[in-house]
Amino acid sequence: MATYDKNLFAKLENRTGYSQTNETEILNPYVNFNHYKNSQILADVLVAESIQMRGVECYYVPREYVSPDLIFGEDLKNKFTKAWKFAAYLNSFEGYEGAKSFFSNFGMQVQDEVTLSINPNLFKHQVNGKEPKEGDLIYFPMDNSLFEINWVEPYDPFYQLGQNAIRKITAGKFIYSGEEINPVLQKNEGINIPEFSELELNAVRNLNGIHDINIDQYAEVDQINSEAKEYVEPYVVVNNRGKSFESSPFDNDFMD
């Protein structure tokens, strides 16, 4: 250890001071910066208060797993049957993040992303007592958008006062793929929920059971079939399941 003049440091009446702390302690035992409970509680409450003052209302729709496949990491029977209203701070008020909307080889793609900040204790109080997980859904009624949580960042900011009072959620537009999605609004005791909040979830319930991304089911397919009638000849599907036929559907010109 580097040598120094101990007389440079102030000493208490019992002749102790920082000189002794420097020689015998890992951290200063008289200063509790990272583990002072009162400061941690104050910071946590201030974050929660700020979110409730400047935040937005969202709906949390957790994914329920019925029969998860541990090999492929998926559950073909997963469903969404419950929803809670909660407060979140919208980090990106300038607009959505991500690749946004663009045309690709597969048509128009919408890859909007949003970043939300929540206070974990406030979130657990308003929701189901648990923190959000990847794969759960967030409905943003202000823009009538449904997002799927991609990542929950627990370390930004990193341990202020020795505790994390913020969770940052990164979510992308949800792509419906046949799941049962019929959320019912849950009303925790003691939390004021407006009477008609349940109606806001109708937009989410309308996804349940659809097979096409268009409002009119199979509208694009029907249009293609209609335009193709002039050029496409009738055909028979050969898979041993269709109607029986006496001759081969392939004519001689095709076989040559």
Swiss-Prot record:
Answer whether the UniProt record assigns the keyword Iron to this protein.
no
An example GO CC term for this entry is: virion component
- Tell me the first and last residues of the signal peptide: none
Give the UniProt keywords, A-Z: Virion
Keyword Signal assigned to the entry: answer is no
Cellular location(s): Virion
Q: Which cysteines are joined by disulfide bonds?
A: none
Q: Which InterPro entries match?
A: Phage_T4_Gp14_neck-protein (IPR021674)
Pfam families, per database record: T4_neck-protein
Instruction: Provide the assembly information.
Output: Gp13 and gp14 form a hetero-oligomer complex with a stoichiometry of 10:5.
Query: What's the stated role of this polypeptide?
Result: Plays a role in the association of the virion head and tail after packaging of viral DNA within the head. Together with gp14, forms a neck at the portal vertex of the head to be ready for the tail attachment.
The name under which this protein is listed is Neck protein gp14
Q: Which organism is it from?
A: Enterobacteria phage T4
State the encoding gene.
Answer: 14
